């Protein structure tokens, strides 16, 4: 590409302060340095995690910032020493990097590379950024920042994918789908013929249902107070749909009545800390497994769970990004989609452009949208 080695001026959505609308700005994207990759972004999903953090003061010291992390694009150029991708490759952004060398990368039971530390700084280039706007250094959300026409990332945060992959579809595999599907396949290890319940029917919750179905679950109960989501849940594999508000008794008692003694596997995907106890209580007392999927409402929240729920054999565990070793396994998920092993198309309900990013945010907040994709 004729842009190699040059600063690229392009458009991006910039968050100047928490709670403010995203601003469409011209930014400058410098060439990649050693072990870095510059990417022409093509599509990005708008994730619930982006929405949650837009209005929180947690990001105030990192503004200006480019939000977004669920993205795909084409490699424009690479820095010295990059070997896993080259110019022209289709790539997917990795919400958790995989260096392949640290203690956790070498542990088969762990998917949290120590280089995830970069996400806390929101800087993709070891203490700095290759992106500026109006003379200011621009941070990149969790060291990615996909709401931009171009970005620069570390090689360990990028993976090559199938050259035939439809980027406007597979972008959501990078976070939302991988998180939910993997929670069922890897974290819970759902078994054939089992019973499952899924609390929360957003994009991640529906992806859990797809995972439960793929694992051979016999009964999958979708739980949400938004009945508009029930048809979509049935489309992707739910056998039953329940609104807790339709009953006078607690949801755990409702599910225990539906499935004698409780379900084998329950997934809490609402992010509501108060729902964790109900999800655990919905599991069979002797062998039920409850998985909290993704981030709860706040990292400082305290769980209040009745101790008797642990008296027998129930298990409560967490799951982050579905337990996938990202650089190795996220591309395989893209290939599995191409091979029609599962269908993510029903999860994408809206497709907009970068200039419509604020409309996408409002759609997600309103509950009218499962997953919105921005074309860049």
Swiss-Prot record:
Broad enzyme group: oxidoreductase
GO terms classed as biological process: retinoic acid metabolic process; retinol metabolic process
Function description: Alcohol dehydrogenase. Catalyzes the NAD-dependent oxidation of primary alcohols to the corresponding aldehydes. Oxidizes secondary alcohols to the corresponding ketones.
Quaternary data: Dimer.
Cofactor: Zn(2+)
Name this polypeptide is given: Alcohol dehydrogenase 6
SMART domains the UniProt entry points to: PKS_ER
PANTHER family membership: ALCOHOL DEHYDROGENASE, ALCOHOL DEHYDROGENASE 6
Record's GO cellular component terms: cytosol
InterPro entries, per the entry: ADH-like_C, ADH-like_N, ADH_Zn_CS, GroES-like_sf, NAD(P)-bd_dom_sf, PKS_ER
Upper lineage: Eukaryota, Metazoa, Chordata, Craniata, Vertebrata
Keyword GTP-binding (UniProt): no
């Amino acid at each position: 590409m004729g842009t190699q080695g040059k600063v690229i001026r392009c458009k991006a959505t910039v968050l100047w302060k928490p709670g403010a609308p995203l601003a469409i700005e011209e930014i400058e994207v410098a060439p990649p340095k050693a072990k870095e990759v510059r990417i022409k972004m093509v599509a990005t999903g708008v994730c619930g995690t982006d929405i949650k953090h837009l209005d929180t003061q947690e990001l105030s010291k990192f503004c200006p910032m480019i939000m977004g992390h669920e993205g795909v694009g084409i490699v424009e150029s690479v820095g010295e020493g990059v070997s896993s991708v080259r110019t022209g490759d289709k790539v997917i952004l990795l919400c958790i990097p995989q260096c392949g060398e640290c203690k956790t990368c070498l542990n088969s039971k762990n998917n949290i590379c120590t280089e995830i530390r970069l996400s806390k700084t929101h800087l993709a280039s070891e203490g700095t950024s290759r992106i500026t706007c109006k003379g200011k250094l621009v941070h990149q959300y969790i060291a990615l920042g996909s709401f931009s026409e171009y970005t620069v990332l570390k090689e360990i945060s990028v993976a090559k994918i199938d050259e035939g992959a439809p980027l406007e579809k597979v972008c959501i595999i990078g976070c939302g789908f991988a998180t939910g599907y993997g929670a069922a396949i890897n974290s819970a290890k759902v078994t054939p013929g089992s019973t499952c319940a899924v609390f929360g029917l957003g994009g991640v919750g529906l992806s859990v249902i797809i995972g439960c179905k793929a694992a051979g679950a016999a009964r999958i109960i979708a739980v949400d107070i938004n009945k508009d989501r029930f048809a979509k849940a049935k489309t992707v594999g739910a056998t039953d749909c329940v609104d807790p508000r339709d009953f006078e008794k607690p949801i755990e008692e409702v599910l225990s009545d539906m499935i004698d003694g409780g379900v084998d596997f329950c997934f809490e995907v609402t992010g509501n800390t108060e729902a964790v106890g109900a999800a655990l209580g919905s599991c069979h007392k002797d062998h039920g497994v409850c998985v909290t999927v993704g981030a709860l409402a706040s990292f400082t929240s305290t769980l209040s769970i009745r101790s008797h729920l642990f008296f027998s054999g129930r298990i409560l565990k967490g799951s982050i990004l579905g337990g996938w070793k990202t650089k190795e396994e996220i591309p395989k998920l893209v290939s599995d989609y191409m091979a029609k092993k599962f269908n993510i198309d029903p999860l994408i309900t809206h497709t907009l452009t970068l200039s419509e990013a604020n409309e996408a945010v409002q759609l997600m907040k309103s509950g009218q949208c499962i997953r919105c994709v921005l074309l860049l």
